[in-house]
């Protein structure tokens, strides 16, 4: 059971998990050998990815929408217009379905997701979940940027399979080319995060730097997960991007976007920080205010 905070209703809710029974079974220590087959072998994600790209996979769209109460009024396409399950999964939304804060000093969410956020981070001991940490060096597979983000802020956006799976730029600026790091395909669900130490450092991931106009150099990292054989970047490197513009998308599966900010660049909203310190994620949508530009008093 995963409990998260809904800041609109100011109450806790229980997340409805796609494949919950399978996840609990896979991440039980007794099944670790089978888990390795699923997560450490590319063929599993490849085969399932091929199925999700096929016309046959459209048969599961309607039941998925009904089971998880997905609002198709937000989608540019109707259920019958999708060519595959991945076509549905990577669907685009109508422009009026999300509000992007235009104020340049407002920090927004890049994705529909559940959020954990931490300020003044120890780059050698970044929190994955309570009781489980990893280092910035492990995550990037390099130590060249460690000093730049020392004592900065880290925000983790976990996208579950039922979420809209495109991610966006949180500010205008210029984004560098994408750096790819090979890895496994563990689930990023909290069930898995509690069982697999330094999970984010083991999965397939990509990172880039958004040289933003208002929040300094923002390190963007996208982490793949079970059945996500592909992270697709749709932006053009080293060209001007705008706030709210699409950066890319994940194909089928849960996945994560992690943002790192330099010290004294952002102030994260207090309710998100409080819930994170209590161990609860906070639900957000693309464009939601999650903080503001740092201002010294």
Swiss-Prot record:
EC number(s) from the headed UniProt entry: 4.1.1.65
Record-annotated site: Cleavage (non-hydrolytic): 254-255
Keyword annotations: Cell membrane, Decarboxylase, Lipid biosynthesis, Lipid metabolism, Lyase, Membrane, Phospholipid biosynthesis, Phospholipid metabolism, Pyruvate, Zymogen
InterPro entries named among the record's database cross-references: PS_Dcarbxylase, PSD-B, PSD_type2_pro
Subcellular location: Cell membrane
Active site: 112, 168, 255
Any single biological process term in GO: phosphatidylethanolamine biosynthetic process
Modification Pyruvic acid (Ser) occurs at: 255
GO cellular component annotations of the record: plasma membrane
Co-factor note (free text): Binds 1 pyruvoyl group covalently per subunit.
A matching Pfam family: PS_Dcarbxylase
Pathway: Phospholipid metabolism; phosphatidylethanolamine biosynthesis; phosphatidylethanolamine from CDP-diacylglycerol: step 2/2
Catalytic activity: a 1,2-diacyl-sn-glycero-3-phospho-L-serine + H(+) = a 1,2-diacyl-sn-glycero-3-phosphoethanolamine + CO2
Cofactor: pyruvate
Highest rank taxon of the organism: Bacteria
Keyword Membrane: yes
PTM field: Is synthesized initially as an inactive proenzyme. Formation of the active enzyme involves a self-maturation process in which the active site pyruvoyl group is generated from an internal serine residue via an autocatalytic post-translational modification. Two non-identical subunits are generated from the proenzyme in this reaction, and the pyruvate is formed at the N-terminus of the alpha chain, which is derived from the carboxyl end of the proenzyme.
Membrane topology (UniProt): Peripheral membrane protein
Molecular-function GO terms, alphabetical: phosphatidylserine decarboxylase activity
NCBIfam families per UniProt: PRK00723.1 (NF001941), PS_decarb (TIGR00163)
Subunit description: Heterodimer of a large membrane-associated beta subunit and a small pyruvoyl-containing alpha subunit.
Primary role: Catalyzes the formation of phosphatidylethanolamine (PtdEtn) from phosphatidylserine (PtdSer).
PANTHER family in UniProt: PHOSPHATIDYLSERINE DECARBOXYLASE, PHOSPHATIDYLSERINE DECARBOXYLASE PROENZYME 2
HAMAP family: PS_decarb_PSD_B_type2
Family: Belongs to the phosphatidylserine decarboxylase family. PSD-B subfamily. Prokaryotic type II sub-subfamily.
Protein name per its UniProtKB record: Phosphatidylserine decarboxylase proenzyme
Origin species: Clostridium tetani (strain Massachusetts / E88)
